[in-house]
């Protein structure tokens, strides 16, 4: 049973605060309507649970402004699902669609 769930982001301010307070941050852009995204968030939560670490997600349908902001900040074209790994506020890794899984997320840290 995976009890460690990603934390929901619901504002740009909250996102910036998370980046400020944490050196290493995983963020997932999640689409409520996409089956691939449903699998991606399962993998994301499993990864966080295995690592016993916090991670963050936003629902693109609800957080359009934040989603656009992340696209601008990272210069990475918006996809969903899409995962990012931030180190000291910089997105050093990203993946989308079927490329989001426990193994690829673990690889981001290397």
Protein language model regions, located:
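Short, Lys/Arg-enriched N-terminal segments with co-localized hydrophobic residues
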Residues: 1-4
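Short acidic-hydrophobic, aromatic-tinged amphipathic segments that line or gate anion-handling sites
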Residues: 6-13
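Local sequence-structure signature of Cys/Sec-based thiol-disulfide redox active-site neighborhoods
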Residues: 16-47
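Thiol-based oxidoreductase modules, predominantly thioredoxin-like and allied folds used
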Residues: 29, 53-67
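Short cysteine/histidine-rich metal-coordination sites, predominantly Zn2+-binding motifs
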Residues: 48-53, 104-105
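Structural micro-motif
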Residues: 74-87
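Non-catalytic, surface beta->alpha helical segment in thiol-disulfide oxidoreductase systems
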Residues: 85-110
């Amino acid at each position: 049973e995976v009890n460690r769930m990603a934390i929901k982001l619901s504002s740009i301010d909250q996102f910036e605060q998370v980046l400020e307070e944490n050196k290493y941050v995983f963020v997932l852009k999640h689409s409520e309507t996409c089956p691939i995204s449903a699998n991606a968030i399962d993998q994301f939560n499993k990864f966080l649970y295995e690592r016993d670490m916090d991670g963050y997600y936003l629902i693109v349908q609800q957080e359009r402004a934040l989603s656009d902001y992340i696209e601008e900040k990272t210069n990475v074209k918006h996809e969903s699902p899409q995962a990012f790994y931030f180190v000291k506020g910089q997105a050093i890794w990203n993946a989308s669609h079927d490329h989001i899984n426990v193994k690829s997320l673990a690889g981001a840290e290397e």
